[in-house]
């Protein structure tokens, strides 16, 4: 036996399944995408150990920082299974920045985490391009992130996403819910679709009912069902920020996991209760389809999905009509959906017979 045959195997990171060269190439490729999100306070250059942000250059005098992080849930699996990687990054940004704006904070910078078993640069670039698009829609800079190639952690072709965003609000201008009062009007801003919550139920229905996602939707023969389901989460930052700063909004609730019932109470002080009338807006064809396919009760709809409303505003009744008109002029679809009343902290959603396919008038309540 030769010395060469006796030589022990030489291990490397590449043999373990990690391609450092591919990771470096990805950083170089996505650099211009990050650069395109530059804004006052950040130049959005990638490659360092961290990203800098200059609050003074962003125009703040005595700011409070507000931080949030989130993911996209199993909507990512839809993107993977149907090669729809280009917009899932918008969802990632939306889930974070919409959570900041409800506290009165302007999103300033964003960092992403992309984890996979084997790095596919083509897919990763498409995902990051969507993240950059989301950052531009929100007015925040993509200043860094992490790409983790972890063999054995994910099935072939799978990946997961997480986002982290920091915003700022001048001291004393933050929204905490303490300005909400009895009699306040609740305005609802339309969602763009399912957004990023409830997809475990959506995917279960798709599997059990044998949906053909690459074919026209049963309720719309001009658009594929997958296009409805993968529609990115709406980003409300630019339309809401001017009215927050002018003091015209008392509270905001981002309608995510827990639906209308569980998210609105998060911004209410004790002793106040939100009443929402489901008759005040028309159920979308997509939501009606999901409900019918799953024989889902109205209460479960109100606790699982946004039901067509992605953001709820509490506003002074004297200003409600004017603010609704101004938001419509800013591009939002606005509904007057309810009121604030005295009562135990919580939310009640009501509907008449046939609303959300109910056989009789119904009411669903969450306390807490």
Curated annotation (Swiss-Prot):
Assigned protein family: Belongs to the AIR synthase family.
Subcellular location: Cytoplasm
Catalyzed reaction equations: 2-formamido-N(1)-(5-O-phospho-beta-D-ribosyl)acetamidine + ATP = 5-amino-1-(5-phospho-beta-D-ribosyl)imidazole + ADP + phosphate + H(+)
UniProt superkingdom: Bacteria
Keyword Ligase assigned: yes
InterPro entries: PurM-like_C_dom, PurM-like_C_sf, PurM-like_N, PurM-like_N_sf, PurM_cligase
E.C. code: 6.3.3.1
Protein's UniProt keywords contain Ligase: yes
Organism: Novosphingobium aromaticivorans (strain ATCC 700278 / DSM 12444 / CCUG 56034 / CIP 105152 / NBRC 16084 / F199)
Pfam families attached to this UniProt entry: AIRS, AIRS_C
Protein name listed in UniProt: Phosphoribosylformylglycinamidine cyclo-ligase
GO cellular component: cytosol
CDD domains from the UniProt entry: PurM
Sorted UniProt keywords: ATP-binding, Cytoplasm, Ligase, Nucleotide-binding, Purine biosynthesis
Any one Gene Ontology molecular-function term assigned to this protein's record: ATP binding
Transmembrane residue ranges: none
GO biological process, one term: 'de novo' IMP biosynthetic process
Pathway(s) served: Purine metabolism; IMP biosynthesis via de novo pathway; 5-amino-1-(5-phospho-D-ribosyl)imidazole from N(2)-formyl-N(1)-(5-phospho-D-ribosyl)glycinamide: step 2/2
């Amino acid at each position: 036996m030769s010395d060469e045959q006796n030589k022990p195997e030489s291990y490397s990171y590449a043999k373990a399944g990690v391609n450092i060269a591919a990771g470096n190439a990805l950083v170089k490729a996505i650099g211009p995408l990050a650069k395109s999100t530059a804004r006052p306070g950040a130049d959005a250059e990638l490659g360092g150990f961290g990203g800098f942000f200059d609050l003074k250059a962003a125009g703040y005098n005595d700011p409070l920082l507000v931080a949030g992080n989130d993911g996209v849930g199993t909507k990512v699996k839809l993107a993977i299974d149907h090669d729809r990687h280009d917009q899932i990054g918008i969802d990632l940004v939306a889930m974070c920045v919409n959570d900041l704006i409800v506290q009165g904070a302007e999103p300033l910078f964003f960092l992403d985490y992309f984890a996979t078993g084997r790095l596919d640069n083509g897919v990763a670039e498409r995902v990051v391009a969507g993240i950059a698009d989301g950052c531009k829609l929100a007015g925040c800079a993509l200043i860094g992130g992490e790409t983790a190639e972890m063999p054995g952690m994910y099935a072939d072709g799978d990946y997961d996403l997480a986002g982290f965003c920091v915003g700022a609000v001048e001291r004393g201008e933050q929204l905490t819910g303490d300005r909400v009062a009895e009699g306040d009007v609740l305005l609802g801003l339309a969602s763009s679709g399912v957004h990023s919550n409830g997809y475990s139920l959506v995917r279960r229905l798709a599997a059990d009912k044998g949906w053909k996602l690459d074919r026209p939707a049963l309720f719309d023969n001009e658009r594929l069902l997958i296009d409805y389901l993968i529609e990115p989460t709406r980003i409300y930052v630019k339309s809401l920020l001017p009215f927050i700063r002018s003091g015209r909004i008392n509270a905001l609730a981002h309608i995510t996991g827990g639906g209308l019932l569980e998210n609105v109470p998060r911004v209410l002080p004790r002793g106040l209760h939100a009443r929402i009338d489901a008759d005040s807006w028309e159920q979308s064809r997509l939501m009606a389809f999901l409900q019918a396919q799953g024989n889902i009760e109205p209460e479960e709809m109100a606790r699982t999905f946004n039901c067509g409303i992605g953001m709820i505003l509490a506003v002074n009744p004297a200003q409600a009509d004017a603010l609704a008109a101004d938001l419509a002029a800013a591009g939002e679809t606005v509904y007057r959906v309810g009121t604030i009343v005295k009562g135990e902290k919580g939310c009640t959603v009501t509907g008449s017979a046939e609303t959300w396919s109910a056989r009789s008038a119904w009411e669903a309540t969450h306390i807490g």
